[in-house]
């Protein structure tokens, strides 16, 4: 399978990407159902946004109290609550991911253990279990962030599982990945940049 978007173009759009990520994606992207330029551009734009330009393969939860109030208002409804959790990533994860995605309550520690990792930032005990089943071998959540091949495969699994290659809309794909439209402007910008460039 040939990538419809060249490595030169990829490097222009994601200049700080981890070395080898383009090759790792190229080797797997067809398994995600991304066989044309539009589908590949969508995959790269969304994964590029989720991983901070293919730099971070682990969710950053080091929020200020104001960031918590703005991003996770449901879990931090007032400044006093937000200030108790400020700059405490493990406590933040355990609160925002408690009792959902297969995780236990806040005290279980599941939120931190199963926080977002990989290109697509898979999150939650249920998603990690489903990914392990698809992969056909047992892995620990921490293995995903430290292994480029696994980081790419989480995105391939997620893309295939949720049939994202069939959604020809940045907004629709973003909602499936994010649950809302966080970062929609950047996602659209990346997608357009990947689509307008010619194969070098």
Curated annotation (Swiss-Prot):
Q: Which GO terms describe its biological process?
A: cell wall macromolecule catabolic process; chitin catabolic process
One MF term in the entry's GO annotations? chitinase activity
Q: Which family does it belong to?
A: Belongs to the glycosyl hydrolase 19 family.
Organism of this sequence: Haemophilus influenzae (strain ATCC 51907 / DSM 11121 / KW20 / Rd)
Task: State the Gene3D superfamilies in the record.
Answer: 1.10.530.10
User: What is the phylogenetic placement of the source species in the record?
Assistant: Bacteria, Pseudomonadati, Pseudomonadota, Gammaproteobacteria, Pasteurellales
Q: What parts of the sequence cross the membrane?
A: none
State the name under which the record lists this protein. Glycosyl hydrolase family 19 domain-containing protein HI_1415
Q: Which domain of life is it from?
A: Bacteria
Q: Which residues form the signal peptide?
A: none
């Amino acid at each position: 399978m040939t990538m419809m978007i060249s490595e030169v173009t990829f490097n222009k759009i994601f200049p700080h990407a981890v070395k080898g990520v383009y090759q790792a994606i190229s080797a797997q992207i067809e398994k995600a159902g991304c066989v044309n330029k539009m589908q590949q551009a969508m995959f790269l734009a969304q994964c590029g946004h989720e991983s901070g330009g293919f730099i971070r393969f682990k969710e950053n939860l080091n929020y200020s109290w104001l960031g918590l109030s703005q991003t996770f208002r449901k879990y931090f409804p007032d400044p006093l609550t937000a200030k108790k959790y400020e700059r405490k990533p493990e406590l933040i994860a355990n609160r925002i991911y408690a009792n959902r995605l297969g995780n236990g309550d806040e005290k279980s520690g599941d939120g931190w253990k199963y926080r977002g990792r990989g290109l697509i930032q898979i999150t939650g005990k249920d998603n990690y279990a489903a990914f392990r089943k698809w992969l056909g071998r047992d892995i620990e959540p921490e293995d995903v962030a430290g292994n480029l091949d696994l980081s790419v495969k989480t995105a391939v699994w997620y893309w295939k599982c949720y049939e994202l290659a069939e959604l020809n809309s940045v907004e629709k794909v973003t909602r499936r990945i994010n649950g809302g439209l966080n970062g929609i402007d950047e996602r659209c910008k990346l997608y357009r940049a990947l689509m307008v460039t010619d194969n070098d």
